[in-house]
């Protein structure tokens, strides 16, 4: 039991109820589930809450296409979502829907409190209207050119390329995504939440440590641009909750979606006598509330949501934790390549615990994107889980059953066990701070030590010598005890494996019984706990995920971007003498790390084969630091040092691409050596 029991409410972002869960979504639910399970393992009161996000124009239109009512469609999708989550061993304490009585009541109650406090304004606006469909177009159903960076094919409310947020009417050359028609302007009265009134409070909350530093920095940029009043209403036809005393006007989905966290918890409280809603959501609540989200919805969760709660006299989240996107094999998930993988497709072919472990092994507290490299995935699972972890039990358990009646020995030398137990708080701290990758590395380092102990002791040899039976008994018992400790450390990540090990060891694995004396304890006969990942299973997933290339090719051609040469024409000619001044050298990236308070930069230490230079490179959006270390690249070695806010940059690395994720550093072929001149 933890020294002081905490009361914790934790949420994941609500999956949208118009389609299936895919492996990009699963990153967040696995991350949150691991953290929630860890809190429970430590003895804390922790409630993991989620719901389907079931409102909005996309759901209304999708239901029309399917010939269903929106209510029937979201009910069907919710069943599919719940099945996928359950099969991935996601342990929600409650999974509900935003289309619920609890959510309707809470949304109306919060709105009325905001209205009565003077935080709701009304004004007539000009909005884009689809003349063919006779409907006002929500932000996501208008596409055009970003008014800031001029990127084409961007949504009506924000730009995926530069991150700008703007009014739909600011979009250049807008088109209706519903009909393709050019929308017309039409006046309508809308309701606005007075977000600027909360600027001071938000700045204080953001700088209190409630957000990751990268998030706080990004929000600082939005404050510089100035907070705007937030449009919280939509016109009929719309699937959602009608605004009180405003016929034909509905709450925008992003108003009632985060309230869905509260609605789901309210639903849980209604089912149980031992839970009180106000204990977690009242202004003076001492409980902890944590939201795990993707980096694409930071704006809503870190500005609108806490401001709404403050205005309604409710408590704000303790923290909001954002994560990055999932790429597959180093690229954006692709339906044509078969890397846009649905959760169900994965589950039809592979053990969910494999993906839980792989994601955990690569997750940190930062907002970096995570690459699901399928070859590395197979190798890591086979090496770590099968080759190291399960191998400990498979090499020793049989001897206990066959030679010692399934009973464990009294361990004479407990030094190895004590060294494993000494890592308990280190690993706990890694879980608590969401440094799951560090926790996995710590556990696998211990697994290496345990396997080395078994290899050096060679119980399969000892067992052949009648005089060494007790020693063999000691070694096998010690190995199984170390195995028990390791599986307990991994229990939040691998709950099904832990359950199977509990059946095998005939005891519950808890954080509090790690140091229990197992002398004389009887275990069950060992059964295989985990199979190796076969590449044919991965290939089957890819094939099952591919869509017909001819179907996807045509729309891609229609919206094809300009060629790189058209986007960035060749510069004016320079003389050979000017070019000769540039000293290009091969360099090895000896170290790469994030730069605190910098959104785009990585600090690189470049080895030139006898000299080291420090370079600040704007490649953070495309590379994780650990993926760069050891690589060869090309740098401008004689660039004059430049004093930056973070230190002196002594050169420049060469990279190609338009920016964002689409950046590629120059990597010379094998044979090039640090210090070589590029001619």
Curated annotation (Swiss-Prot):
EC number per UniProt: 6.1.1.10
Which sites bind ATP?
Answer: 335
Gene Ontology annotations of biological process type: methionyl-tRNA aminoacylation
Q: Which reaction does it catalyse?
A: tRNA(Met) + L-methionine + ATP = L-methionyl-tRNA(Met) + AMP + diphosphate
Which residue intervals define the domain tRNA-binding in the entry?
578-679
Give the co-factor note: Binds 1 zinc ion per subunit.
Q: Which GO terms describe its cellular component?
A: cytosol
Which enzyme class, named as a word?
A: ligase
Renumbered ranges of motif 'HIGH' region: 15-25
Q: Which Pfam families match?
A: Anticodon_3, tRNA-synt_1g, tRNA_bind
Q: What InterPro entries does the record tag this protein with?
A: aa-tRNA-synth_I_CS, Anticodon_Met, Met-tRNA-synth_bsu_C, Met-tRNA_ligase_1, Met-tRNA_synth, Methionyl/Leucyl_tRNA_Synth, MetRS_core, MetRS_Zn
Which Gene3D superfamilies has this protein been placed in? Answer: HUPs, Isoleucyl-tRNA Synthetase, Domain 1, Methionyl-tRNA synthetase, Zn-domain, Nucleic acid-binding proteins
Question: In chain numbering, where does the motif 'KMSKS' region fall?
Answer: 332-336
Give a GO molecular function annotation for the protein.
Answer: metal ion binding
- Per UniProt, which keywords does this protein have? Aminoacyl-tRNA synthetase, ATP-binding, Cytoplasm, Ligase, Metal-binding, Nucleotide-binding, Protein biosynthesis, RNA-binding, tRNA-binding, Zinc
Would I find Manganese among this entry's keywords?
no
Q: Where in the cell is it found?
A: Cytoplasm
Binding of Zn(2+), residues: 146, 149, 159, 162
Family, per entry: Belongs to the class-I aminoacyl-tRNA synthetase family. MetG type 1 subfamily.
PANTHER family to which the protein is assigned, alphabetical: METHIONINE--TRNA LIGASE, METHIONINE--TRNA LIGASE, CYTOPLASMIC
Describe its function.
Is required not only for elongation of protein synthesis but also for the initiation of all mRNA translation through initiator tRNA(fMet) aminoacylation.
HAMAP family xrefs: Met_tRNA_synth_type1
Its quaternary organisation is: Homodimer.
Name the chain's protein: Methionine--tRNA ligase
Gene behind the chain? metG
